Amino acid sequence: MSTYPGGWPPPQNQQSNRRLLVVLAPIVVLLVAAAAIGIGLLARNAAAEEIPGTATAAAGGSTPANVLADGAVRVGESDAKVTVRVVMDLQCPACKAFEEANGKVLEDAVRDGTAAVEYSVITFLDRAGTTEYSSRAGNAAFCVANSGVDGYQAWLSDMFTEQPAEGGAGLPDSALIDIAESAGYTDPAVAQCITDRAYDGYLRTKTDEVLNSGVNSTPTVTVNGEQVTDAAALMSPNGLAVVIAAAR
């Protein structure tokens, strides 16, 4: 996590000292806030700025079905002995790398009952594009979950396969609808939800809650509540399988 350069020059006299106290007080508050969430997630604050020509996030918003109270989508048996939680932003390149390395591990674990997986999709990377792709994709995550979770992991895999490069326009809503339909989400209500950004407000509320809980990077992965920090487990092919097996 990045940090700010430390230290300010000492005041030269009492008058300058008083001026510095006035000027530095709000700066210190800002620095403390930045240190608390990490420089990477400060981008989220700027991302709240309205981007001309795109939809604007609504306050509040509807609550989708098939989600936990904290907004995560749980896939797998309710009594699974192992619970894996993945916090992700669908525009995050490291999240794509994690999915490529361990997506099948998680699908297999759900299929054979070894583990349940809770996917917590957040948005803080709208600044990485020009059309608020991060939040549009996050909204789509709740649109498909609201319709059912049976195809959710396949949908996630397809979303990361089609993840756009940072800095561009991202995928249009029509492409998000196509990906959903390819994963089996053919109900016209899903397409309408994606176009209307029906869960945009809900997504942003849950994002705030996740960030306030102490998450400061994506992907953040936990197994039975213990954060996985080993890079090999996160990014090596099938690396998470060993961690899941050890937690059984």
What residue spans do the PLM features occupy?
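Stable alpha-helical elements in mature extracytoplasmic
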Residues: 102, 136-140, 151-155, 172-176, ...
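Structural alpha/beta surface segment adjacent to cysteine/selenocysteine redox centers
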Residues: 88-90, 96-173
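Amphipathic alpha-helical segments within well-ordered protein domains
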Residues: 141-142, 160, 177-181, 191
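A structure-centric signal for secondary-structure junctions around beta-strands
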Residues: 81, 137, 217-218
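Short hydrophobic/aromatic segments of transmembrane alpha-helices and their interfaces
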Residues: 75-77, 173, 182-183
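Extracytoplasmic low-complexity, Pro/Thr/Ser/Ala/Gly-rich segments
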Residues: 46-113, 121, 245-248
